[in-house]
């Protein structure tokens, strides 16, 4: 569904993927681990609860500050790339608490978006994905009760939660980019078929088709791993390798689609310009290319994978 939606509207598809992967994680925990997440799932299904995430920008290091107070914590931070923030109901986020015994500790918790200490800033003015509403979210002393802390971990270290997120979230997120690339290919071929092609033009179409095939095969493999594997360092390795393949191939499809379309593709009304811009978002999700290559190299050498 996300790939099909991405063909038509990348921003809507990406925002939906950011909500959907959190629902999918909760459902996986309920089904596989017997975790008590049914209440959350019912709120999503029955009440239309919309979930925002700051996980991509926080990632393993975490960010923000949590100060211990009676009964919980006061949290301070500015979260970026919070897709769907203007219409979200709750944000799954984190902050770093300096534990006097354990040292820096990342705390994970849900935070209501209507909390008076939470503000969605009007600063989403970007190259692409302009319709995602991924504004910064300012958190200025929001109270988080002890009971609301869902998990804690050491900053910068791979935690089982992140292997699970990698396995489930990234096939969804990169379905969006595969869909945008599908749409770019279709537009380019439609424009190319309107005029006679010389050998150079036909070769450009063949090059586009080969690149799209690499992306398509990578995406199908990514979805298969996410559906059949169990979270682990090796599963994350496979998912992130495929994330690199799908993301780079999707961006290449966008570029080659412009070559195939010719000058007509330069006009915004043709639909390639926005797709090209939206595809650039594929480079910014973790693990970014060099981080993925480092992870892959460490896995191959049998070294510690922590970044």
Regions found by a protein language model. Give the residues of each.
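Buried hydrophobic positions in well-ordered alpha/beta secondary-structure cores of metabolic enzymes
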Residues: 1, 75-77, 139, 181, ...
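Glycine-rich flavin
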Residues: 1-87
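DPxDG-like acidic metal-binding loop motif
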Residues: 78-115
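Glycine-rich beta->alpha junctions and the first turn(s) of the following alpha-helix
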Residues: 126-213
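Generic structural signal for well-ordered, non-transmembrane alpha-helical segments
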Residues: 179, 206-213, 240, 244-251, ...
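Amphipathic, well-ordered alpha-helical segments in soluble domains
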Residues: 180-187, 218-221, 249
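C-terminal helix-coil-helix/basic helical segment that borders enzyme active sites and/or dimer interfaces
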Residues: 193, 214-245, 255-266
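Glycine-rich phosphate/cofactor-binding loops in nucleotide/flavin-utilizing enzymes
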Residues: 264-307
